[in-house]
């Protein structure tokens, strides 16, 4: 009895191992496994028929035996056809599986690239958030400084108003003092003139 080529066993084993690590395309892998079993069964049946046909040809040569040989040949031909079809189907499924695995690798690469992009964007977001926070704190500090300056200006304005009022009050008091002094000086001058009038009259 002949066995399947080693590359088929190794290929199927590698597919099953990959399926354990990453369970994708399970239907394709199962179909390949079933075809592998079918091919093995067909080859075993073909070998058994060949062996039985060879022994029958050695033991009998009558027409009945020849008819049996013809029937066995037809069965062998059918088995060969089935085997060829099974192998063709297996190759097509293996091709589909290869394409699916290639697509999976492409998607994995894209997923890894997307994850890298997301990490980069997250880093940028954290950096921008930190900058915005720092700028807000800076603006709050400047706003507080502006408020302090405004409060100081208000206080200085109030002090200036008080000083202006005091200045006006002092100016008014000075004006009153000057006015009273001038009035007093005028009264004293008039009194002196009145006192000196008799003296001027006697001299005349």
UniProtKB/Swiss-Prot annotation:
It is found in: Preautophagosomal structure membrane. GO terms for biological process: autophagy; protein transport. Residues 51-69 have a biased composition (Low complexity). Pfam families: ATG16 (PF08614). GO terms for cellular component: phagophore assembly site membrane. It comes from the Eukaryota. It is a peripheral membrane protein. Residues 50-69 are annotated as: Disordered. The keyword Hydrolase does not apply. Keywords: Autophagy, Coiled coil, Membrane, Protein transport, Transport. CDD domains: Atg16_CCD (cd22887). Its main location: membrane. Residues 24-183 form a coiled coil. Homodimer. Part of the ATG5-ATG12/ATG16 complex. Several units of each may be present in this complex. Stabilizes the ATG5-ATG12 conjugate which is necessary for autophagy. The ATG5-ATG12/ATG16 complex is required for efficient promotion of ATG8-conjugation to phosphatidylethanolamine and ATG8 localization to the pre-autophagosomal structure (PAS). Also recruits ATG3 to the PAS. Involved in endoplasmic reticulum-specific autophagic process and is essential for the survival of cells subjected to severe ER stress. Belongs to the ATG16 family. This is Autophagy protein 16. It comes from Pyricularia oryzae (strain 70-15 / ATCC MYA-4617 / FGSC 8958) (Rice blast fungus). The gene is ATG16.
